[in-house]
């Protein structure tokens, strides 16, 4: 097929046309200024590295997500020796506690997230195993797999 690109002062248009003369048009706004340095938010080093089964984690996060609400939408992940405890507690909804086996050796530590922000990248991955790296409860964490993929996720403060 063919692609026709039209650029004006404040937008760009991409017209996609195939052999059957059917097509699609994508229009985007152009913004002024320099592209932000996204590498600044990607942690270069991490204190903790955890390896987990993607499907098992995904199902556990979905179950924990049921026990959250708009006001209290966090799931706490507590990592200990080869064990992950996922907890969510919403007074008007209920409480969830689930454990799963992981590959981790280190001190016990916890971090909390909006579960949907963890579920979204897991849904996009085909790998069976993921690596989660983080430094502390308030710094960004990184989801990695054994290929060029990186997903930065911000934790939530919990009381």
Range-by-range predicted roles:
Residues 1-29, 46-159:
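DNA polymerase processivity clamps
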Residues 32:
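Flexible glycine-rich active-site/ligand-binding loops centered on an Asp-His dyad
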Residues 41-44:
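Short hinge/gating elements
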């Amino acid at each position: 097929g063919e692609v026709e690109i039209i650029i004006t002062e404040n937008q760009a248009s991409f017209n996609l046309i195939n052999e059957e003369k059917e097509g699609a048009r994508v229009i985007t706004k152009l913004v002024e200024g320099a592209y932000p340095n996204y590498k600044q938010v990607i942690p270069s080093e991490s204190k903790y590295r955890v390896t987990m089964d993607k499907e098992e984690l995904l199902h556990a996060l979905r179950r924990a997500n049921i026990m959250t609400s708009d006001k209290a939408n966090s799931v706490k992940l507590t990592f200990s020796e080869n064990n992950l405890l996922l907890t969510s507690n919403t007074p008007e909804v209920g409480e969830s506690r689930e454990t799963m086996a992981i590959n981790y050796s280190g001190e016990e530590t916890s971090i909390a997230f909006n579960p949907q922000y963890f579920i979204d990248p897991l849904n996009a991955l085909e790998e069976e195993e993921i690596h989660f790296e983080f430094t502390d409860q308030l710094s960004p964490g990184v989801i990695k797999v054994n290929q060029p993929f990186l997903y930065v996720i911000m934790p939530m403060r919990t009381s």
